């Protein structure tokens, strides 16, 4: 990595030991001669990871950020000069639902009690966009807005990811999903550990009757895009005014260099 110009920052690098047990064992990790700080949770690519992979801190942070964004919808949905429901739903999808979707494949392994905290954000956003009362039934909100519950949406995004991953065996995550390890351990009735994505998604694939072996592999181009010849663009007609140039002249001049 040093040859490629990449260097780890000693002050920004942290270590975290993922462990489900009660004992808190943290190995000493050194970067050169500097000991890396050991933390209980850290943010990586917008997701907050904790030692036990409960994603409780991430869900709390995500809920707080989404509730602040809902204030924008409340302002825009003014009864006198506010936007209509169609525009408000688009704003909700762009500002709030996009945040809920990001990383849902990862934090979807959290327990249901933590994930339900996000359902209130989703339902509140739909109520604001539709102008519905607080007593409106949740299934009616989903039907009127054309939205599904967050649980079904997370499942949809997960299945889309798995199907796309199946078409690319060169992906680094391919073996982890389709060649899982310790399957028998997670299938034990006494196991309390959360199964990985590869095991959680199997019942849904079987219920949907998706034939994974029939998914075609994605074809990669033989030549890299940056190695292709740059196409020649003819801009001769830009020197003539449209008013002074007839349609027939334009057609003849544009086809002449290609004959």
Region roles according to the model:
Residues 33-105:
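Basic, alpha-helical interaction scaffolds
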Residues 2-9, 76-83, 105-108, 133-134:
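Surface-exposed helix-capping loop/turn segments at secondary-structure junctions
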Residues 3-40:
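Short, conserved micro-motifs composed of acidic
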Residues 20-33, 53, 78, 85-87, ...:
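RNase H-like, metal-dependent ribonuclease domains
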């Amino acid at each position: 990595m040093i040859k490629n110009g990449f260097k780890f920052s000693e002050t920004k690098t942290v270590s975290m030991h993922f462990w489900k047990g009660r004992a808190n064992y943290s190995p000493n990790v050194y970067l050169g001669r500097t000991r890396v700080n050991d933390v209980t949770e850290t943010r990586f690519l917008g997701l907050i990871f904790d030692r036990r992979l409960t994603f409780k801190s991430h869900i709390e942070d995500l809920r707080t950020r989404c509730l602040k964004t809902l204030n924008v919808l409340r302002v825009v949905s003014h009864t006198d000069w506010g936007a209509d429901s169609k525009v408000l739903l688009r704003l909700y999808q762009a500002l709030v639902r996009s945040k809920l979707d990001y990383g849902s494949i990862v934090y979807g392994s959290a327990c249901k009690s933590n994930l339900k905290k996000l359902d209130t954000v989703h339902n509140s956003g739909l109520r604001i966009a539709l102008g519905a009362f607080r007593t409106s039934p949740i299934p009616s909100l989903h039907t009127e807005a054309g939205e599904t519950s967050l649980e079904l949406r997370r499942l949809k995004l997960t299945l889309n990811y798995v199907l796309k991953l199946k078409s690319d065996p060169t992906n680094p995550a391919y073996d982890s999903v389709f060649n899982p390890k310790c399957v028998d351990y997670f299938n034990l009735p006494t196991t309390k550990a959360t199964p990985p994505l590869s095991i959680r998604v199997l019942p849904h694939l079987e219920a949907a009757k998706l034939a994974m072996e029939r998914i075609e592999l994605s074809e990669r181009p033989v030549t890299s895009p940056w190695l292709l010849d740059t196409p020649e663009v003819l801009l001769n007609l830009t020197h003539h005014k449209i008013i002074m140039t007839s349609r027939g002249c334009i057609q003849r001049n544009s086809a002449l260099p290609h004959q």
